[in-house]
């Protein structure tokens, strides 16, 4: 179990991030209520998640399906679980009825599998389209040029609802370097939103991580994905 000291540290970290979000919202003329702080809890033990839960977090993000499925029954039922990592089609069936939002849909084939499982389990699944705005070869995501067509194709599938876009910006020393990518994603969402496509909302932009979330908030992010800023450095040994 974590010590009380560690519980205090996690609560302090969580509240510091919330305060930074509040300030970024004020700078951008936004309400703090417009931004969800997603606690990225991958590789972290359940008791650390409970500490952050007690600090006020209700949205938690996991990268791996197995870890997500393992953690859900051990934690309070009012948590909203987000899958933010790359999703393989053969793992879809394990999570469609368990997650609040899938951030990482980047192909029609994946969306079709989500649709099949959603219909089978009689659930409605909310998704974001992952866009590789920075065109990094190491990252998943569709291109900005192909996003609208993908959105149109997925919008026709039963049981799947597009709620917006997600991007993973490059890891940079200066968060200002990523402002242009956040701006591009927001503009892409505006452009697609203006097309008024049935079964498509562009209300959620999932962008910004520990190193650059304040800039992302200033540029219109609705969900910031913060792991290290809350939990500290990840311990990858837990995943082996």
Positions of PLM-derived features:
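Gly/Pro- and small hydrophobic-enriched strand-loop and loop-to-helix capping segments
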Residues: 221-239
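Conserved alpha/beta-domain cores
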Residues: 1-211, 217-219, 231-233
